[in-house]
Amino acid sequence: MRIQLNTIDLQCIIALSCLGQFVHAEANREDLKQIDFQFPVLERAATKTPFPDWLSAFTGLKEWPGLDPPYIPLDFIDFSQIPDYKEYDQNHCDSVPRDSCSFDCHHCTEHDDVYTCSKLSQTFDDGPSASTTKLLDRLKHNSTFFNLGVNIVQHPDIYQRMQKEGHLIGSHTWSHVYLPNVSNEKIIAQIEWSIWAMNATGNHTPKWFRPPYGGIDNRVRAITRQFGLQAVLWDHDTFDWSLLLNDSVITEQEILQNVINWNKSGTGLILEHDSTEKTVDLAIKINKLIGDDQSTVSHCVGGIDYIKEFLS
């Protein structure tokens, strides 16, 4: 596939300058700290999406970065608009001020955060992975996937299949970093490289963003908003990742019973993962319980799918 871009589109992708135009957990926190999402931990991504010439010219690099992507300054990011909250990790929520509106620590949401839906709907994090294809084979409706940039460039065929079948794809950062614990520059790097992975693989720029571990506060929001991104959280957590642990905090049957209970109300966004075969098998069982009357995040709130889609 050869991308056909006009001058304005090319400038928009390279500098992300077009983005300025668009501009509840249920388990014990100690259990949550054991998360193992099992996305590929590599020194350098096993690249399958070619590193585009326009990105090489802009960044000075020749290949996709490893798990710690370099910060590339962007002229539209206004650091004066970013509040000066202290960085914190997942083990120190007691020191996080309430006015920072931390979702992970205080279950706080802002006016533009999406955290529920009028139809009970599944959402999937951490892909694309080899297991994602099994889930796609099952889905008879459009769903929302929040993809890691490092996985997008390794599985462009799966990413493009999701796109072709009408699923909504949002950013989940480049390499699954807990954003409140890193500098402003590192947050920007995680976002910009995830967007560039989507640009290069799917010819589009995301509107929707889900922070890894639900780690978002008003410092993180002040940065992601400048990219035109809107945060998507959740009000139903399956804790499916815990099934990968030797000492799981919840059983599969308990998860399925929770879904049955949630389905009685018929509303909400469910957090799941398509990163492993085990979580995908569970997702298929959940899908059978809920059925096909589900919505993408954009349809839940009557929003757009993407900020920009480039012709190919």
Swiss-Prot record:
Modification note: N-glycosylated.
Comment on activity versus temperature: Optimum temperature is 50 degrees Celsius.
Upper lineage: Eukaryota, Fungi, Dikarya, Ascomycota, Saccharomycotina
Family: Belongs to the polysaccharide deacetylase family.
Positions annotated to bind acetate: D125, Y213
Cofactor dependency: Co(2+)
Record: residues binding Co(2+): D126, H172, H176
Position of the signal peptide: 1-44
UniProt-listed GO biological process terms: ascospore wall assembly; chitin catabolic process; polysaccharide catabolic process
Annotated PANTHER family: CHITIN DEACETYLASE 1-RELATED, GLYCOSYL TRANSFERASE-RELATED
Organism name: Saccharomyces cerevisiae (strain ATCC 204508 / S288c) (Baker's yeast)
Active site residues according to the UniProt entry: D125 (proton acceptor), H273 (proton donor)
EC class: hydrolase
Major localization class: other
Name of the protein: Chitin deacetylase 2
This protein's record includes keyword Signal: yes
